[in-house]
Each structure stands twice: as C-alpha cells, then as structure tokens.
C-alpha cells in the first residue's frame, strides 16, 4: 500500500536501520519521474514478458476468494509452469491441509551449490478478498489492461508478486542459474481472512523444514507515487501491526415492535459503535515509524514535513498530530486503530431485536498486548449491556525482523540501478502480512515489492482494484535482480 498520499494531503480531504543510514539514503534525492518502461525492460533483457503476463493473467483469473474460490487449483496451475520449465517432481510439491481441500498451496525449490548456506524463501499468498461482480465496473476475475493499468481482484494484493516469484523460478531454471543459496518458493492460502486456515501458519507448524530459510521475502509495503505519478520513495517493511477482531454484542428479551422500549439491543450497540468512531488511541513511536517520518520529512517538506519533525520531538504536539492525521496512512502509522467492519442485528422485521453485534477490526500497534486493547474498548463502549470479546486469536506476536546491512544493501543497490535518486525508506505497515507467522517461527521475513503504487493504494480490498502495468513489469525486474543478489551472498 502506498504510504505517501500527496493528493489527499493537498486537498486536506525490524534491529533497525539507523538514523545516520537514513540520512545517507535520502542524500541521493527526493524523487524522480517515471523512467520509460521500455528502458527498464531493455536493461533486464526483457526476457519472457509475454510469458510472465500469461502467468499473471492465469493467476488473477483463477478465483481464490474464500467463499467460492480454489487456492489449490491456483497452486496446481503455478506448479505446472515450474514442471514445464524442468523442475523435477520432488522439487515441486502441492500441499493440502486436512479438511481444507481448496485451501492448498505450493512449495518448490531451486537447490543451491553451498549446503552450508541457508535458503532464501519467496513467500506469497494467492487468496484474495471477496469481490462481487455486480459491484465492480469490470469483471473482478478477468485481467483487464486499460489506460496503463491492470484491473482485477488480486492484481495488486498480491498476485503480481506471486506471479513474479513463479516467473523468477522459471527464469532461473531456464538460465541454468546456480545460486549459492537454495531458492525456495511458497504460495499459500488464507492470508486475507482471519477466520480461515492460514497457509503460512500451517507450514510453520507442520512443514517447518520445507520452508526453512535464512530469511523470507513477501509483501508488506510498496513504492510510493504522488498524484502525478512521480516516484517518492521505495519502502521496506520495518514493522507491522497485528490485525485483531473484537466483537461488541448486546442481548435482551426483545418483544413486539408495536411496544418499543428504550432498552433496545440495536440502540445500545449503535451508541457503543459510535463512541468507537470518535475515539483516537494515543500516538506511539517506535524505531519503524521514527525512521519513516525522519526520512519522509525531508521528502515532503513544508508544513507536513515540519509536522513530522515536531511529532518525532514531541508525540503530544496536538497541532502537529492533527496535521499528519489528515493523511489516512500517516494517521494509521501513529497509533492503534479500531473500526467497525460488520453489523448483525434482529431476527424479524416486526420484533424488537433480541441480539445485536458488531465486528470491530483493530490494527494494533507493535508491542501492545491484545488484552490492553480489549480493556480499552470496554471502556469506550461505556455500557454494561455491551459485552466486548475476542472471537479468535490469529498468530503469535513476535518482534519484527532486523533490517541488517545484508538485507538492506542489495535493496539499495538494485533500487539505484533502476530508479536513481529514489530513496529507500523503512516503514511501519498499518496492515498485516504472513510475516506474523514466519517471524515467530524463526524465519526473519521482510516486505519489499519494488512495485510503485498510486496514492489511493490501488483500491486493494475495494472496488476496481488496479495497479500500473509499468509498475508490475518494473517490480518483476527489481525482484528478479534482488533475489539473484541475495542468493549469491
């Protein structure tokens, strides 16, 4: 997701990289214009673009939503590309957790030459958020290229990167590439739905050896574009929030709708949910958002840059916080956030409701216990009739992976090759990724895509999801070079 929403601001509508390193990164400049797509592809030899696009199209057009989709089918289709490239059966494996026939995934490996070096893991989820055809302008499960964009569910989150990982494996095999480290690929299901079986978590628990690696690469943050399409910065995931659902529930005896009473379950619930909408959790700073705002202050400049600097000096500076809060991404990076996402109430149109409930999805700031948020939500509800609970806990809480020079330097190197002058900036991701399962399992996991996105974030999880065609092709070049560099460290 793009962090710097220049248009929205204008209209007012993990160990860590040090501050000295940030200064060096930003010394090379604030932003650059788009280079020509042809130039970047020429630099990469433009090998197999049509084949990659076909793989991407096949993946997008395989419905992998939880309700009616089939991740196992998507994994099988991607496995076919690897086998066609010459991978033996023992190096390409479909896994299907018991009781979840359509929630399977893929594990594959290109063996390295140095058995003393641990592997690098390329991780992607292939499941997508639900998409209703009647709500979309275009068919969400048809890859449509229009006006310089790819449209379709999963085009941005995250089938572009999943297709790039598959494409990398095919290219490496066909080139006869002999990496020092083994290169592993894992495509999983269940990342997008908290109540679903998570494939990455399942692998960490049941197939730990198969995905064992020195570190893993996955989604998390993208490159930032402004409203004019100028590159602002390439972000690296330095930390991420934890996604946790809470339930507000009210029950009572109900009754006949002709005899209304003040003690109405819906009224209790609506008032409590409204109080959630008005509450702001306090500003918190850690290494990740400090590094981000330190870097972005120099890029953004002006009133907003000054506000970033002021908040870093004093998180209680109300005026500075108010300035940053006008940008939805910056607002989310500064604190825990909670929002109502689903409502359910009543049992008949002519009866007083016996039950009313709401799902409150919170993105919890790193290091804050779930129980602390539960306690605060109970205080916010401020009504003994409203019971607040945690329906399920998804994944353990673990510290983020350290951004060591071994990880950071190759990213800087490849970014400079492709986009001279664009700074590399660590970021705190307000969302969550499968890193939440791999980091606790002892596999440091980093989010970097090389895909630059618009200020609207490409409408991920929303209607008419899209990503720039050029961004996808450049991300392909970036990740191809980056993985090769890591594999020979």
Where are these regions (language model features)?
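Bacterial N-terminal signal peptides that target proteins for export
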Residues: 16-27
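Acidic/histidine-rich catalytic neighborhood of metal-dependent amide-processing enzymes
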Residues: 149-150, 156-235
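Acidic/His- and Gly-rich active-site-bordering loop/insert found
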Residues: 43-153, 172-181, 360
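An extended, acidic, His-containing surface patch that forms the Zn2+-binding/catalytic region
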Residues: 115-117, 224-225, 284-350, 354-355, ...
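Short, Lys/Arg-enriched N-terminal segments with co-localized hydrophobic residues
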Residues: 1-18
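Bacterial N-terminal signal peptides
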Residues: 27-37
């Amino acid at each position: 997701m793009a962090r710097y929403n220049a248009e929205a601001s204008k209209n007012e509508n993990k160990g860590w990289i040090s501050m000295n390193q940030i200064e060096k990164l930003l010394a090379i400049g604030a932003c650059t214009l788009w280079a020509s797509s042809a130039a970047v592809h020429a630099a990469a030899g433009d090998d197999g673009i049509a084949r990659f696009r076909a793989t991407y199209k096949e993946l997008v057009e395989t419905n992998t939503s939880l309700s009616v989709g089939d991740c196992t089918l998507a994994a099988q289709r991607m496995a076919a590309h690897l086998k066609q490239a010459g991978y033996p059966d023992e190096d390409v494996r479909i896994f299907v957790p018991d009781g979840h026939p359509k929630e399977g995934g893929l594990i594959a490996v290109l063996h390295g030459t140095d058995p003393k070096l641990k592997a690098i893991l390329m991780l992607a989820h292939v499941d997508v958020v639900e998409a209703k055809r009647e709500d979309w302008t275009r068919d969400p499960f048809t890859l449509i290229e229009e006006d310089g964009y790819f449209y379709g569910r999963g085009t941005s989150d995250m089938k572009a990167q999943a297709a790039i990982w598959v494409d990398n494996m095919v290219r490496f095999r066909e080139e006869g590439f002999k990496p020092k480290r083994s290169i592993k690929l894992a495509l999983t299901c269940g990342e997008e739905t908290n109540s679903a079986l998570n494939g990455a978590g399942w692998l960490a628990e049941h197939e730990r050896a198969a995905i064992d690696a020195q570190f893993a690469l996955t989604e998390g943050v993208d490159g930032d574009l402004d409203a004019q399409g100028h590159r602002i910065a390439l972000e690296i995931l330095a930390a991420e929030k934890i996604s946790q659902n809470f339930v507000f529930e009210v029950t009572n005896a109900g009754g006949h709708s002709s005899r209304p009473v003040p003690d109405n379950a819906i009224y209790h619930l609506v008032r409590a949910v409204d109080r959630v909408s008005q509450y702001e959790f306090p500003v918190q700073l850690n290494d990740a958002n400090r590094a981000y705002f330190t870097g972005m202050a120099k890029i953004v400049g002006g009133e907003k840059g000054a506000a970033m600097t002021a908040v870093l000096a004093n998180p209680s500076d109300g005026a500075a916080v108010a300035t940053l809060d006008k940008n939805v991404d910056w607002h989310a990076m500064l604190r825990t956030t909670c929002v109502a996402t689903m409502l359910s109430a009543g049992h008949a149109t002519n009866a007083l409701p016996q039950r009313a409930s709401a799902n409150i999805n919170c993105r919890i700031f790193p290091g804050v216990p779930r129980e602390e948020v539960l306690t605060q939500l109970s205080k916010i509800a401020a009504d003994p009739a409203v019971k607040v609970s945690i329906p399920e806990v998804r994944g353990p809480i673990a510290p983020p992976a350290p951004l060591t020079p071994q990880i950071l330097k190759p990213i800087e190197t490849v970014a400079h090759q492709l986009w001279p002058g664009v700074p590399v900036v660590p970021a705190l991701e307000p969302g969550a990724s499968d890193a939440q399962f791999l980091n606790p399992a002892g596999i440091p996991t980093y989010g970097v895509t090389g895909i630059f996105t618009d200020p609207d974030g490409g409408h991920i999880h929303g209607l008419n999801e899209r990503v720039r065609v050029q961004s996808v092709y450049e991300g392909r070049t970036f990740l191809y070079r980056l993985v090769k560099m890591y594999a020979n460290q």
